[in-house]
Every structure is written in structure tokens, then in C-alpha cells.
Regions:
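Stable alpha-helical elements in mature extracytoplasmic
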Residues: 68, 80, 113-116, 120, ...
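A mature extracytoplasmic/lumenal domain signature
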Residues: 74-76, 86, 104-106, 114, ...
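Mid-length scaffold segments of soluble, non-membrane domains
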Residues: 92-145
Length: 217
């Protein structure tokens, strides 16, 4: 081996050690707490908002409150559109501590605050033929859940987490809290909700082999 090659190999080893060290150091840094974020609720410890990992299909979406609208379509007696303020001011608010489990193996327990999804959907007068609720997001993501599940589990559409308005990276203006389902059902940046009877509908990850049921076993 020539002296030149030995020097190159030595430099590569040093660079590798430096990058590994940086990675270990960054993993051990304390995670930033959002100003005003609560870490405990009624005796239960909560995860940090920054404990979430970024795994959206196109990165965090920036949606303006002033131009946002949520449309309810499909098997309803009337298509209806809500502004952000209309949802915030018209519907009863609920809180619940729920854990999101990701298929990647991590989980977070958060205090969510929002609105019963069923109450929002009923404003459009749900047709008796409706069986499935399909959700569409600003970034092109979609997923679906049975209407009975949404009713029976009292699923909420969250606008706050740990007492703070959802930050853009966590789904502002609204994130679905699909408790007992894996994280890919917890759709963020929702812009349209469609009532359907298409039991075979599959969303973004479901068409790529993920379970359409997504129940945590």
C-alpha cells in the first residue's frame, strides 16, 4: 500500500469518527420544549411535541388560517364548507389523553383538544348509505376509517396538543386523533372529508401494502 493511500484511508477513518460522534452528541441533546407546553395532565405524564418524528409524504405544510376551509362532501344531504374560525367557535371542545403508535416502533402520549368529528359531519346531514369516511390532506395524503368507528370511539378532530395550537409540522389547522389505530391513520392538514359507501377504498399507505384496518393489536 502506498503512503498516499494510507493517508487517504486515515483521513476517511477520522472523518467517520467525527460524524459518528456528532450523531451521538445530537441524539443526547435535550429536546426543546414549546413555550407554554404542558407535560402532565391529571397525574399522567405527557410526551413532548418534539418527541414526534417527521415522516409525512411531502414535509410540513404551511396553511394560512385566513384562507383555510374544510369541506364535507360525498353521501351527505348538503355539501358544507367551514372556515377555521367557524369550527373553532361553533363546536363543543373536548380533551383526551391518547397515545399515537407509529408502525416504525415509536409512540407519543399527548393531551389532545378538539371537536367530535361526528358532530361536524352531522352538520352536512349524513346519508343513511354512508359507511366509510375518507380524509384528504393538503399535501395529497389520504386515508379512510369506518363511520361506525368514528361514532363509537368518539373520535376527535384536534386543533391543540399539550395545550398549544397545533404547530405546522404537527398538522395545523387540524389533525385526526385516530385512537387505537396506527399513526398513518392520524391524518394531518385535513382539507376535505368525504362520506362514502366504498368499503374497498384505500388511502396513500394502504395502497402501498399497509393494513386498511390499522388496529393496534
Amino acid at each position: 500500500m502506498t503512503k498516499h493511500k494510507q493517508i487517504l484511508i486515515g483521513l476517511l477513518v477520522i472523518i467517520t469518527i467525527i460524524f459518528v460522534g456528532i450523531g451521538i452528541y445530537s441524539q443526547n441533546l435535550p429536546k426543546k420544549l414549546y413555550p407554554g407546553e404542558v407535560l402532565e395532565y391529571e397525574g399522567q405524564d405527557l410526551s413532548l411535541i418534539n418527541d414526534f418524528r417527521e415522516n409525512s409524504i411531502k414535509g410540513p405544510q404551511q396553511i394560512k388560517e385566513s384562507t383555510y376551509s374544510l369541506t364535507i362532501t360525498g353521501l351527505v344531504n348538503q355539501t358544507i364548507e367551514f372556515s377555521y374560525d367557524e369550527i373553532i367557535n361553533e363546536f363543543q371542545k373536548y380533551q383526551k389523553v391518547t397515545t399515537l403508535h407509529c408502525v416504525e416502533g415509536w409512540s407519543v402520549t399527548i393531551l389532545w383538544e378538539g371537536f367530535l368529528l361526528e358532530e361536524i359531519l352531522e352538520k352536512a346531514e349524513i346519508s343513511s348509505d354512508s359507511e366509510v369516511v375518507i380524509f384528504y390532506a393538503y399535501d395529497g395524503y389520504s386515508t379512510s376509517l369506518p363511520l361506525d368507528y368514528i361514532r363509537n370511539q368518539e373520535i376527535i378532530l384536534a386543533y391543540k396538543m399539550n395545550e398549544l395550537i397545533l404547530p405546522p409540522e404537527r398538522g395545523f389547522p387540524f389533525q385526526l386523533v385516530a385512537e387505537s389505530k396506527y399513526g398513518y391513520k392520524w391524518i394531518k392538514w385535513i382539507t376535505e372529508i368525504e362520506l362514502s359507501n366504498d368499503l374497498s377504498y384505500k388511502g396513500y399507505w394502504e395502497t402501498r401494502g399497509f393494513s386498511n384496518d390499522a388496529s393496534i393489536k
